[in-house]
Amino acid sequence: MRGRDEDTGEFRGASRSQQRREALEIFDLGEKLVALTPAQLAKLPVPESLIPHIEESKRITSHIAHKRQLAFLAKHMRREDDETLDAIRDALDANSDTARREVAAIHRVERWRERLLAEGDVALAELLEAYPAADRQQLRQLVRNAIHERAKNKPPRAYRELFQVLRDLSQKPGLESGDAGLEDEESASENDE
């Protein structure tokens, strides 16, 4: 199908530069697949014919041999149809969006923890407004202990425990007002910056 059209004299198919760009995109996709854990890989719509090549690429550690194996994997991936490769790309993008949301949730919890340590009862009142089911006494005790540990240069056990309690609190299902409170906190901190 490639070559010149006999009637018009124009080239058919993609240019060599376009073919090179597509090959590099597939090579990069192969690198991303090799970097995934087996559990993450199982969630993706990867054809069974590619799994052994991906596993072999993971096994090889020598730099040049690993690169050669990735090129071999890319060669097999180019044989797959575009719909399959697009489905893999879409699934990888969805996974990265999920990971980004999880990281954002952790950052929100960290901001709450820092606010509790810096502002004390003012931040605690806002947190309890957002999460009415939260245990005020436990949170206040953890904040006090974390401040005390920081002042005495002790290991941050209460600091970590406060994070765990806040994370568990933010992950409880059915706390719609709590989620709104965290979102309000996130947007307020972004507006301050």
Swiss-Prot record:
Localization terms from the record: Cytoplasm
Biased composition (Basic and acidic residues): 1-10
CDD domains cross-referenced by the UniProt entry: YjgA-like (cd16331)
Source organism superkingdom: Bacteria
MF GO annotations: ribosome binding; rRNA binding
One Pfam family per UniProt: DarP
Keywords per UniProt: Cytoplasm, Ribosome biogenesis, RNA-binding, rRNA-binding
Transmembrane segments: none
SUPFAM superfamilies attached to this UniProt entry: PSPTO4464-like
Any one GO CC term of the record: cytosol
Region Disordered, annotated ranges: 1-20, 170-193
UniProt-listed GO biological process terms: assembly of large subunit precursor of preribosome
Ranges of biased composition (kind: Acidic residues): 181-193
Function: Member of a network of 50S ribosomal subunit biogenesis factors which assembles along the 30S-50S interface, preventing incorrect 23S rRNA structures from forming. Promotes peptidyl transferase center (PTC) maturation.
Family per record: Belongs to the DarP family.
UniProt-recorded name of the protein: Dual-action ribosomal maturation protein DarP
Organism: Xanthomonas campestris pv. campestris (strain ATCC 33913 / DSM 3586 / NCPPB 528 / LMG 568 / P 25)
Organism phylogeny: Bacteria, Pseudomonadati, Pseudomonadota, Gammaproteobacteria, Lysobacterales
